[in-house]
Amino acid sequence: MSTEKINLLDFDRKGLRELFAQELGEKAFRADQVMKWIYHFGVDDFDNMTNINKQLREKLKQKCEIVAPVVSEAQHSSDGTIKWAMRVGDQDVETVYIPEEDRATLCVSSQVGCALECKFCSTAQQGFNRNLKVSEIIGQVWRAAREVGLEKETGRRPITNVVMMGMGEPLLNMKNLIPALEIMLDDLGFGLSKRRVTVSTSGVVSGLDQMTGKIDVALAISLHAPNDKLRSEIMPINDRWDIQDFLASVRRYIASSNANRGKVTVEYVLLDHVNDGTEHAHELAQLMKDTPCKINLIPFNPYPGSPYKKPSNSRIDRFQKTLMQYEHTVTIRKTRGDDIDAACGQLVGDVIDRTKRTAMLKAAKGETIEVKAL
């Protein structure tokens, strides 16, 4: 008989209620009480749950546990950004806390590595190892909330937004993504507004269609090219689902969504003399004319061994102004945490299968390969 304890972080409210009924013989309200202790107060010791009777606390200690990823390393940027390496099993993923004047955003990983092989992404060069469990996804948020300080004792702004833009493709981990999102939104969980939780995808149409009508959060799409030829060159997933398939799926999702207010966020990494020409801007503007959107331009953050460069400021400015001629809303993402390699394109993970990474390391003459946040 297995003696492994059940990690309560692996369950959303529905799952936790079922667990309490089937494994503990307890009513739903007891599950709700425990869930509130875990997420509202950051408690991971059953003995500290003071409104739970002793008999139930003993049953919980015998059969269950509350185990989140632990911080194995923390780096602090001069701009307030914090990058945590979080230990999941025998590997690390990275989670980034980004404070601003009116919010604090947490960038969360969904996989160890990534299988999509986007050419500008060093996560892809490391290869794919495994999906994160529910407890390892929501546990990043739980741990970060503890680190930041639930009662503001650290002076840091509490987490107000979560973006699934860390290591991995979220929609290739739907089984564990959905319950984690449910906990983020649940009033007994983190109670975040659906407009403050964002899922980013590189174009996994099957996953996006699965989300449609099932869970409502903000959507960001990693587009990065205005035509299929160029997109297939830098993002091989385009050979499975081309741009028109992708955008049709996006329109289906936002039509059923309140969180997106009828618009999708388009992420577009600018690669010097690859996808950043005026002709690309015109093509992108035409491409998106039937899909209500706001376009977020991301100047490429180089990593050692990368074949791409960041465009000049003049090219970035020209690209933005060209798009704005078509009355698109266009922003340029401000680089945050680049001094600790926590900017978009610079997160460093720990992946066991390093076949691709080893080759990249040799090509970079021994320099560390870095990992992006989508």
Swiss-Prot record:
Its cofactor is [4Fe-4S] cluster. Disulfide bonds join 107-344. This is Dual-specificity RNA methyltransferase RlmN. Its main location: cytoplasm. Its EC number is 2.1.1.192. Reaction proceeds by a ping-pong mechanism involving intermediate methylation of a conserved cysteine residue. [4Fe-4S] cluster binds at residues 114, 118, 121. The gene is rlmN. The keyword Transferase applies. It comes from Vibrio vulnificus (strain YJ016). Specifically methylates position 2 of adenine 2503 in 23S rRNA and position 2 of adenine 37 in tRNAs. m2A2503 modification seems to play a crucial role in the proofreading step occurring at the peptidyl transferase center and thus would serve to optimize ribosomal fidelity. It is an enzyme of class 2 (transferase). Keywords: 4Fe-4S, Cytoplasm, Disulfide bond, Iron, Iron-sulfur, Metal-binding, Methyltransferase, rRNA processing, S-adenosyl-L-methionine, Transferase, tRNA processing. The active site is at 94 (proton acceptor), 344 (s-methylcysteine intermediate). Signal peptide: none annotated. InterPro entries: Aldolase_TIM, Methyltransferase_A, RlmN_N, RNA_MTrfase_RlmN, rRNA_lsu_MTrfase_RlmN/Cfr, rSAM. The keyword Iron applies. It holds the Pfam family Radical_SAM. Belongs to the radical SAM superfamily. RlmN family. Residues 100-339 form the Radical SAM core domain. SUPFAM superfamilies: Radical SAM enzymes. GO terms for cellular component: cytoplasm. Binds 1 [4Fe-4S] cluster. The cluster is coordinated with 3 cysteines and an exchangeable S-adenosyl-L-methionine. S-adenosyl-L-methionine binds at residues 168-169, 200, 222-224, 301. GO terms for biological process: rRNA base methylation; tRNA methylation. It is found in: Cytoplasm. It catalyses: adenosine(2503) in 23S rRNA + 2 reduced [2Fe-2S]-[ferredoxin] + 2 S-adenosyl-L-methionine = 2-methyladenosine(2503) in 23S rRNA + 5'-deoxyadenosine + L-methionine + 2 oxidized [2Fe-2S]-[ferredoxin] + S-adenosyl-L-homocysteine; adenosine(37) in tRNA + 2 reduced [2Fe-2S]-[ferredoxin] + 2 S-adenosyl-L-methionine = 2-methyladenosine(37) in tRNA + 5'-deoxyadenosine + L-methionine + 2 oxidized [2Fe-2S]-[ferredoxin] + S-adenosyl-L-homocysteine.
